[in-house]
């Protein structure tokens, strides 16, 4: 897809993401998205579905964003970069998904995964960046659900700057230092 085709598919002329409510004011859309996604995040945390595969990440992205965007949960089929950082080429997704599924299998077999285990998964999923929007929120919730099934809770930083720097460098050590792991109350 050309840049022009991508823009036409995903953005209104003013740069706001195309959405099911045809909201063209970016600030208004951002607020509505934030509230709607937060409600859905709480619902999933209460349900605590068991994460078994990469497909569950797609389901989460669709659940969080599908009420607002038609493309939610769909894997991207185009190249993407942010701030000079190139994400994985979409034509390599098959191998990456197999790797992630193996990684999830290893995590699910561990009695108590470490913060480094979760940081490594976050780093790998960030590099894949499978969706048009909501990669960070979907991925963090996905990993949080894995942790909950191990009696753990991950505290993500309120300020993402250091975590994003670690992700841009693919430095699991930096990423892990920005997160905290606790036992869950349940």
Feature locations, PLM:
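FIC/Doc superfamily catalytic core
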Residues: 1-186
């Amino acid at each position: 897809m050309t840049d022009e085709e991508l823009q036409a598919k995903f953005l209104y002329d003013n740069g706001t993401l195309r959405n099911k409510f045809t909201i063209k004011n970016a600030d208004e859309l951002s607020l509505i998205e934030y509230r709607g996604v937060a409600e859905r995040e709480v619902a999933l945390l209460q349900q605590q579905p068991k994460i078994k595969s990469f497909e569950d990440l797609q389901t989460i992205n669709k659940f969080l964003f599908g009420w607002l965007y038609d493309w939610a949960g769909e894997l991207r089929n185009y190249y993407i970069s942010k701030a000079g950082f190139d994400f994985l080429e979409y034509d390599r997704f098959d191998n990456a998904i197999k790797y992630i599924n193996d990684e999830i299998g290893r995590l699910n077999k561990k009695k108590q995964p470490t913060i480094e285990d979760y940081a490594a998964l976050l780093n790998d999923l960030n590099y894949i960046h499978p969706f048009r929007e909501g990669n960070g929120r979907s991925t963090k919730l996905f990993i949080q659900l894995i942790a909950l099934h191990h009696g753990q809770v991950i505290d993500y930083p309120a300020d993402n700057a250091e975590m994003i720097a670690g992700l841009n460098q693919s430095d699991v050590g930096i990423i892990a230092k920005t997160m905290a792991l606790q036992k869950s109350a349940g």
